[in-house]
Every structure is written in C-alpha cells, then in structure tokens.
Curated annotation (Swiss-Prot):
Binding site for phosphate: R86, G124, T125, R126
Name of the gene encoding the protein in the UniProt record: rph
Sample GO molecular function, one term: tRNA nucleotidyltransferase activity
Description of how the protein assembles with itself and partners: Homohexameric ring arranged as a trimer of dimers.
Descriptive protein name: Ribonuclease PH
Signal peptide location: none
InterPro entries reported for this sequence: ExoRNase_PH_dom1, ExoRNase_PH_dom2, ExoRNase_PH_dom2_sf, PNPase/RNase_PH_dom_sf, Ribosomal_Su5_D2-typ_SF, RNase_PH, RNase_PH_bac-type, RNase_PH_CS
Superkingdom classification of source: Bacteria
Keywords: Nucleotidyltransferase, RNA-binding, rRNA processing, Transferase, tRNA processing, tRNA-binding
Species classification: Bacteria, Pseudomonadati, Pseudomonadota, Alphaproteobacteria, Hyphomicrobiales
Function: Phosphorolytic 3'-5' exoribonuclease that plays an important role in tRNA 3'-end maturation. Removes nucleotide residues following the 3'-CCA terminus of tRNAs; can also add nucleotides to the ends of RNA molecules by using nucleoside diphosphates as substrates, but this may not be physiologically important. Probably plays a role in initiation of 16S rRNA degradation (leading to ribosome degradation) during starvation.
EC number from the UniProt entry: 2.7.7.56
Length: 238
C-alpha cells in the first residue's frame, strides 16, 4: 500500500493556474499534490551572443527552491555564492525539455527564460517544473502573438510533460511523492512529448538493479501519466 493510499497507476491531484504573475509575459502555478512550483516565462528581444545573426531564438530555464520549501530550512544558494550541482542539472533538464518542442527559427532572434521556483516540495519538483514550464511558455507565446510578434502554433510544435515512476515495495508506481521517493528501490523520471516522443529518461536503482521487464512497466506507467498531463495542459491553455 502506498503511503498516500493511491493506486499504483494513480497520480496526485494536478492543477495549473495561469496568469499568477503581474509582470511576467507568461506564468503558471503548477501543483502536483503538495509539490507547488511557480513558473514564469520572460521575454527578451535579444539572444545570447553566440546566436546573434542566426535568425534563430533561444529558450532557457532556471530552477531554484525557496528556503522553506522543504521540512527544514535550506540555505539560499545565492548566500553560498554558487549553485549546487543538483540545481544546475535540473535547470538544464528543464531547458532541454522545452527546447525539444520549440521551433527556434519561427521564434526569431528573441530569448525566453523560464524560471521555475519551488514554493513547496513533496517529491517530483523537476517533473512539475517541466510540465508547468510548458504552460508558462505557451502563455508567453500567446502574449507575443497578441502583439503580432509570433504565431503560437508555428513556434510551439508540441506539448512536453514529465512524470516520475519508481518501484516502491516491489511494485511499479506512478508519480512518487517524497515519502515514496526517499525509500524507493528504483526512481526514474520520464520526459515525453504530446505525440509520444521521448525527450529524456533518467533512471536509477537504489541498491538493487531493476530488470528490463520492470523498466517496461515503468515506461507503460509513464506514458499513461504523460497522456493525462498533456490533456490537463490542453484544458489549462484552452
């Protein structure tokens, strides 16, 4: 039995709230159960130096956790003077995931930065950030379209979403919360597009290796979860 009493293939309650930031061109507060992430998409009408005069745009991401997003206060990374390795890994993952569904040529020489700030963490912060980050990006592009800068459907080629799966007490389960994630025998994250394309898979065994059959079960769970997330994204931006 899962600590949350959920079925093996049952996700937490997922919600997207758009337009939560007064200043950002696009924003979304995404909730995966008790994991809450504020995603904002900010437009700059310029690109990094290495992309100038290419006619292409760029999408990048930053990620951070508020000090009391966890059970005990975390020291701000800014106070430490540098980002931790985990933070850098996650924000690169978010950026890669979003770029996988963006036509940079159609975006033109502009950059969109998606900031993902974890307000409350209960497992799956990176998957929530990717999924909510797509909604914030969509809202930014919609803002641009209203000003005749781009066409959303030309720039954003597909949905992208992410979900965690793992093996908890010998059973493959979908969308792990912290109580499961912290003791799972296997923990994995799947990033996929709305059309079913695989963007990234991260999978780790904790002590006991997992089999190809178990991986197949996790993949099946992930696909069902991504399908549901994409449906929720569609409703959120409709």
């Amino acid at each position: 039995m899962r600590p949350s009493k959920r079925a093996a293939d049952e996700m937490r309650t997922i919600s997207f709230e758009r337009g939560v930031s007064k200043h950002a061109e696009g924003s979304c507060l995404v909730k995966f159960g008790d994991t809450h992430v504020l995603c904002t998409a900010s437009l700059e009408e310029k690109v990094p130096g290495w992309m100038r005069n290419t006619g292409k745009g760029w999408v990048t991401a930053e990620y951070g956790m508020l000090p009391r997003s966890t059970g005990e206060r975390m020291r701000r990374e800014a106070a430490a003077g540098k980002q931790g390795g985990r933070t850098q890994e996650i924000q690169r993952l978010i950026g890669r995931s979003l770029r996988a569904v963006v036509d940079m040529q159609a975006l033109g020489e502009m950059q969109i930065t998606v900031d993902c700030d974890v307000i409350q963490a209960d497992g799956g912060t990176r998957t929530a950030a990717i999924t909510g980050g797509w909604v914030a990006l969509h809202e930014c592009l919609r803002w641009m379209e209203a000003r005749q800068m781009v066409r959303v459907e030309k720039v954003l080629k597909d949905h992208v979403a992410a979900i965690s799966c793992g093996i908890y007490e010998g059973v493959p389960v979908l969308d792990l919360d912290y109580a499961e994630d912290s003791v799972a025998e296997t923990d994995s994250n799947f990033v996929m597009t709305g059309k079913g394309g695989i963007v990234e898979i991260q999978g780790t065994a904790e002590g006991v290796p997992f089999s190809e059959e178990e991986f197949g079960a996790l993949m099946k769970l992930a696909r069902s979860g991504i399908d549901r997330l994409v449906s929720l994204q569609k409703m959120a931006v409709a």
